[in-house]
């Protein structure tokens, strides 16, 4: 992976700030020292930052919960001893459950959320007013704050399947996930990029477990899971010895610039050799009216969480690649990246964002 992200680096153990408390459909993540309390008077000045996170247990819900912890620094928290190292002053991050990415975007549009985490293809569709956003129209004020990871197209078939490649799935029954789910929406986009548009397959709405059982009975020919790598669900399927992965690559030259090819390394999953796959960035997005000081603070907080040792690897992890942006960057986020890049040890294959 050429451009890692703040989130992927923090997942690797570079210091999350705080924990998550799930209540009433909201994961409340507060970054302050154990035993500390927020002054009731100071609490009146807190700025809530609600992040559309998808359904509980989804990859994006976990990402949103971690980001909420990293950026939180509400009034009465411990004093910050370094710029950005303790979150955004006065901010309280909340990971808010939503039905799916479309719900996240529409809630952001309707100002009941301050941000959302979606894949770049969903952000692009929202900006353009296409696909699931055709009725609502373009969200022209959608802005990117930072890339927060990537999800990879996993195509699973039964071990005894005769399919040797993705082209063999044309006209076949492919389980793409629950209808209108994060997985189903992005799976369609990635399969289309691989040369299998929806009109060339028989898309089946099904949960992964049900689809996996259907593969063994022959009711389904393939299942698609768009997930982080490694995926727990894919790992369990491969460990059973009853399934295998098919590779995929971008077909044609007119695919969106934010899609790219990724390799699933040999051994990443039990019994799986190196396999080519298609990936798409996951993006923290907000409206253009997000106050500049908050956009700036978010970038700095995520930067510092990713770079405790100021290593070259960590430096590369936080910087987004211009070529993979699907929506314009918030100007203050872009400016913060530009400034921080000047202090980084090295940033191979990456640039500060521009619009």
Model segments located where?
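Bilobed "Venus flytrap"/periplasmic-binding protein-like clamshell domains
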Residues: 48-84, 147-217, 312-315, 319, ...
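An extracytoplasmic/periplasmic, membrane-proximal ligand-sensing/linker region
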Residues: 206, 210, 227-236, 245, ...
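Ligand-binding clefts/hinges and TM-proximal coupling segments of bilobed small-molecule sensing domains
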Residues: 171-189, 258-328
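N-terminal hydrophobic or amphipathic helices and topogenic motifs
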Residues: 2-7, 13-94, 103, 140, ...
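A structural signal for short loop-to-beta-strand junctions that line the ligand-binding cleft
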Residues: 134-148, 153, 268-276
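Pocket-lining segment of extracytoplasmic ligand-binding domains
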Residues: 120-122, 129-131, 161, 197-285, ...
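Pocket-flanking alpha-helical
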Residues: 81-135, 155, 209-215, 220, ...
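Sec-exported extracytoplasmic/periplasmic mature domains
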Residues: 68-77, 109-113, 128, 192-196, ...
């Amino acid at each position: 992976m050429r451009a890692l992200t703040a989130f992927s680096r923090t997942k690797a153990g570079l210091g999350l700030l705080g924990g998550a408390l799930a209540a009433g459909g909201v994961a409340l993540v507060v970054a302050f020292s154990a035993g500390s309390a927020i002054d009731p008077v100071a609490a009146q000045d807190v700025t809530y930052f609600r992040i559309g996170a998808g359904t509980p247990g989804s990859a994006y819900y976990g990402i949103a919960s971690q980001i909420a912890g990293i950026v939180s620094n509400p009034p009465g928290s411990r004093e910050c001893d370094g710029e950005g190292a303790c979150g955004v002053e006065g901010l309280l991050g909340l990971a808010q459950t939503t039905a799916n990415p479309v719900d996240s975007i529409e809630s952001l549009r309707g100002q009941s959320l301050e941000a959302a985490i979606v894949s770049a293809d969903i952000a692009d569709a929202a900006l353009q007013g296409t696909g699931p956003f055709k009725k609502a129209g373009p969200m022209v004020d959608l802005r990117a704050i930072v890339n927060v990871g990537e999800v990879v197209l996993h195509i699973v078939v039964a071990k005894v399947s005769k399919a040797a490649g993705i082209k063999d799935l044309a006209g076949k029954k492919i389980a793409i996930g629950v209808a209108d789910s994060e997985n189903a929406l992005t799976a369609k986009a990635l399969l289309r990029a691989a040369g299998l548009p929806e009109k060339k397959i028989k898309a089946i709405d099904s949960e992964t477990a049900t689809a996996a059982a259907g593969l063994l009975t022959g009711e389904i020919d393939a299942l698609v899971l768009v997930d982080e790598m490694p995926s727990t669900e894919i790992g369990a399927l491969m460990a059973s010895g009853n399934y295998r992965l098919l590779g995929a690559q971008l077909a044609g030259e007119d695919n969106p610039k934010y899609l790219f090819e990724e390799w699933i390394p040999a051994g990443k999953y039990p019994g799986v050799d190196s396999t080519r796959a298609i990936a798409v960035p996951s993006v923290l997005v907000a409206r253009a009216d997000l106050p500049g000081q908050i956009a700036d603070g978010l970038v700095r907080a995520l930067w510092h969480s990713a770079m405790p040792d100021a290593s070259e690897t960590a430096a590369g992890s936080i910087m987004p690649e211009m070529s993979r942006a699907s929506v314009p960057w918030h100007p203050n986020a872009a400016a913060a990246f530009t400034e921080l890049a000047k202090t980084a040890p090295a940033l191979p294959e990456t640039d500060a964002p521009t619009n």
